[in-house]
From Swiss-Prot:
Pfam families: DUF7248 (PF23906). The lineage of its organism: Viruses, Duplodnaviria, Heunggongvirae, Uroviricota, Caudoviricetes. The gene is y16M. It comes from Enterobacteria phage T4 (Bacteriophage T4). This is Uncharacterized 4.3 kDa protein in ndd-denB intergenic region.
Amino acid sequence: MLIFALGSVVVGIYLMAVVGMDIHQNGLKSVVETIWNGVK
């Protein structure tokens, strides 16, 4: 269970870093589109 929790934290940080880079490079619009495509 502890391993799963640590994994979730790592994945969360990784996703935040990727989204942060995306915002920095392409602006908020592309991030919204990426999330929207992921939801669909």
